[in-house]
Amino acid sequence: MSIIGIGTDIIEIFRIKNIVYNFKDKLAERILSVQELEKYKVNKNPIKFLAKRFAVKEAASKALGTGISYGIKFNQIELYNNNLGKPKLRFLKYALQKSEEMKCKSIFVSISDEKLYACALVILEK
């Protein structure tokens, strides 16, 4: 296996809090997949939930080599957890097409948050 993409991102949680305060669920509806949106609506800490997903999606788009542009949208990158709680990524639509073009076989994701920040690292391998 060899690394074909690396992306990282850090976001100030307060920034997400301000956006949610001013625009309600507009950001969540824009960046989350249908499954993520369902979890967001019942999450005990929706601001951190949203901040972590924002960071992961930015990091994943950077690992794909495009950033959020060139047809890749936030809701085409889906974060979920396996039965042990390990974070996993699923690419949809154009993000999936891009990962297939890169011959991506494995996706590694790490997420962390503290009081002020959420950060993520995504590594793609072929």
Swiss-Prot record:
**GO CC annotation, single:** cytoplasm
Q: What is its EC number?
A: 2.7.8.7
Annotated compartments: Cytoplasm
Does Lipid biosynthesis appear among the keywords? yes
Instruction: Please list the GO biological process terms of this entry.
Output: fatty acid biosynthetic process
Which Gene Ontology MF annotations are present?
Answer: holo-[acyl-carrier-protein] synthase activity; magnesium ion binding
Cofactor list: Mg(2+)
Instruction: Supply the enzyme class, top level.
Output: transferase
Keywords, in A-Z order: Cytoplasm, Fatty acid biosynthesis, Fatty acid metabolism, Lipid biosynthesis, Lipid metabolism, Magnesium, Metal-binding, Transferase
Q: Which reaction does it catalyse?
A: apo-[ACP] + CoA = holo-[ACP] + adenosine 3',5'-bisphosphate + H(+)
Q: InterPro entries from the xrefs?
A: 4-PPantetheinyl_Trfase_dom, 4-PPantetheinyl_Trfase_dom_sf, ACPS, Ppantetheine-prot_Trfase_dom
Q: Which of this chain's residues are annotated to bind Mg(2+)?
A: 9, 58
Which coarse location class applies to the principal site listed for this UniProt protein? cytoplasm
Question: What HAMAP family does the record point to?
Answer: AcpS (MF_00101)
Its function, per the record, reads: Transfers the 4'-phosphopantetheine moiety from coenzyme A to a Ser of acyl-carrier-protein.
Q: Which family does it belong to?
A: Belongs to the P-Pant transferase superfamily. AcpS family.
Write the protein's name: Holo-[acyl-carrier-protein] synthase
Q: Which gene encodes it?
A: acpS
